[in-house]
Amino acid sequence: TPGVIALKICPDFLAQAPKAPLTICVTGTNGKTTCSNLITDVLEKDGRRVVSNRTGSNIVPGCTTNVINSLTFTGKVRVDATVFEVDERASRLILPYVKPDYLVVTGLFRDSLKRNAHPDYIFSVIDTYCPDSAKVILNADELCSSMLKKDSYRVFYGIGKQPDDKTEPYNLIADYQICPNCGEKLKYNYLRYHHIGDAACPKC
């Protein structure tokens, strides 16, 4: 791919390449492709020139190809916005260099244990390597990712209580049953699945 070739010629291509006026990154365990494609569609319908890695090539070579597609042959930016779908594990190799204006996080869940370990590990990767200057758009219903980048500008989104929601964890895997601040058992006003829902700590 163009990204592989560019990285062989210039390993720090992502850091050196010119940036579009608007850069949006989307990461998370699930829903990255859908979310980034929706954002791209909205921007295009608004009349903006946009490039994105629509097919889900979301590690370093794919994101590098995305940058190449945003440039003319002479290296000038030819788009109004670049949208990156970013693999959550590879975010440490991408976010510091593309320097997003906005980072959208869909949520963090258990994935392949061999690859991603625990959601807390992926949390630490994103929290450490996302530039503080990025405006962060977070899933308020997902307890792990909603705590990202506490010192950055943050906006939250979520879905209100639904008729089939529960009040107690019912999955075999429930990663967040205790408060990350004090260790008290969390009380769920409603719970959709895993740890998606509206939780509060009765102690702090």
Segments and roles (model prediction):
Residues 187-194:
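Short Cys/His-rich "knuckle" micro-motifs
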Residues 1-181:
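Phosphate-binding loop of NTP-binding sites
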Residues 179-182, 201-204:
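Short cysteine-rich clusters marking metal-coordination/redox-active sites
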